[in-house]
Swiss-Prot record:
This is Docking protein 6. Keywords: Phosphoprotein. Coiled coil: none annotated. On Ret activation, phosphorylated on one or more C-terminal tyrosine residues by an Src family kinase. It comes from Mus musculus.
C-alpha cells in the first residue's frame, strides 16, 4: 500500500515524428504506469515547464501492445518503436543510446511484463502469460482513509467469485485485506468512485470503504455478476432443502438440513433472493406446505440490525440493485 504513490516511471526530452509534417520534433515525454488516476500512458508536453504546470498535452494510452523494439541505426539513431496489435506504431528518438535503452527497458517491463533476465538472456517464461493475465484482472484503485483500517493509498483490487482482495501496488504477491462478497451489505459506483459497506462477518468489521478509480463501472459490474451467482446458488440450495423437507415429511422421518449460505441483510439481496428460510422449511412438517413471509432479520439472524434504520448511513438507493452516494459522503 502506497499513500505517496508516484505513477511516473520515466520522463525526459525525446524527438517524436510529426504525423502531419513527417519530421522529428523535440518534446518532453512522460511515461506513467497504470494507477487509480488512469491506465498506462505516454503524455507529451512542449517542454518540462509545461509538464510541471500540467498544461495542454497529448495522451497515448498504452494497451493492446504487440511489441516494443529498438529501430536500426540506419533508420533512426537512438530510436524506440511501440507497435500495437492494429499494426499502428509510435516512434520516438532519444538523445543518447543509454537513454534509448532505458526507455525500452521500462516500457517492456511495464507494458509487456518482461523481466530483466528475460531481456538479457532471451529465455521464454512459460508462466508469463498466466501472470500477465492475472495482472490484467486486477483494477488500480486508491483506498481512501477509513477508521476501520490502518492502511490507505494506492493498491490493486481483485474480484473473484467469492471475495474482494486488495494487493500491494509494489509487490503483487502481498495481500493486504479481503472481504467476502456474501458479507457485503451494499455497494455502488460512479465515474470516479467505487464504494461498498461491509458487515460484521468481515475481518474489518462493519464499515464504509471508498476507492478512487477510473474503473468504477467495470468493478461494479464484476462484483454485481459475482453476487448474482452467489444468490442463484443460494436459491438452488433453498429449493433442494424444500424438496427434501417435503419428501421427509411424507415419510415421517426427521429432517436433516444442510448448512445454508449466509447472505447480507440489504435491499439488494431482498430483490434477488427468496423469502423462504430454514424456519419456514421446518413449518412444512406441522403446518402443511403454505409459506409465511418472515422479516429479513429473522431470515438471516447473523445480520440482525443493531440500530434502527434511521441510524444507518445516509445511502440513497439507485435504480439498480446497488446504490449511489450523496455528495456529502464523497466529500
Amino acid at each position: 500500500m502506497a499513500s505517496n504513490f508516484n505513477d511516473i516511471v520515466k520522463q525526459g526530452y525525446v524527438k517524436i515524428r510529426s504525423r502531419k509534417l513527417g519530421i522529428f520534433r523535440r518534446c518532453w515525454l512522460v511515461f506513467k504506469k497504470a494507477s487509480s488516476k488512469g491506465p498506462r500512458r505516454l503524455e507529451k508536453f512542449p517542454d518540462e515547464k509545461a509538464a510541471y504546470f500540467r498544461n495542454f498535452h497529448k495522451v497515448t494510452e498504452l494497451h493492446n501492445i504487440k511489441n516494443i523494439t529498438r529501430l536500426p541505426r540506419e533508420t533512426k539513431k537512438h530510436a524506440v518503436a511501440i507497435i500495437f496489435h492494429d499494426e499502428t506504431s509510435k516512434t520516438f528518438a532519444c538523445e543518447s543510446e543509454l537513454e534509448a535503452e532505458e526507455w525500452c527497458k521500462h516500457l517492456c517491463m511495464e507494458c509487456l511484463g518482461t523481466r530483466l533476465n528475460d531481456i538479457s538472456l532471451g529465455e521464454p517464461d512459460l508462466l508469463a502469460a498466466g501472470v500477465q493475465r492475472e495482472q490484467n484482472e486486477r483494477f488500480n484503485v486508491y483506498l481512501m482513509p477509513t477508521p476501520n483500517l490502518d492502511i490507505y493509498g494506492e493498491c490493486t483490487m481483485q474480484i473473484t467469485h467469492e471475495n474482494i482482495y486488495l494487493w500491494d501496488i509494489h509487490n503483487a504477491k502481498v495481500k493486504l485485506v479481503m472481504w467476502p462478497l456474501s458479507s457485503l451489505r451494499r455497494y455502488g459506483r460512479d465515474s470516479t468512485w467505487f464504494t461498498f459497506e461491509s458487515g460484521r462477518m468481515c475481518d474489518t468489521g462493519e464499515g464504509l470503504f471508498t476507492f478512487q478509480t477510473r474503473e468504477g463501472e467495470m468493478i461494479y459490474q464484476k462484483v454485481h455478476s459475482a453476487t448474482l451467482a452467489i444468490a442463484e446458488q443460494h436459491e438452488r440450495l433453498m429449493l433442494e432443502m424444500e424438496q427434501k423437507a417435503r419428501l421427509q415429511t411424507s415419510l415421517t422421518e426427521p429432517m436433516t438440513l444442510s448448512k445454508s449460505i449466509s447472505l447480507p441483510r440489504s435491499a439488494y439481496w431482498h430483490h434477488i433472493t427468496r423469502q423462504n428460510s430454514v424456519g419456514e422449511i421446518y413449518s412444512l412438517q406441522g403446518h402443511g406446505f403454505g409459506s409465511s413471509k418472515m422479516s429479513r432479520a429473522q431470515t438471516f439472524p447473523s445480520y440482525a440490525p443493531e440500530q434502527s434504520e434511521e441510524a444507518q448511513p445516509p445511502l440513497s438507493r439507485s435504480s439498480s440493485y446497488g446504490f449511489s452516494y450523496s455528495s456529502s459522503l464523497i466529500q
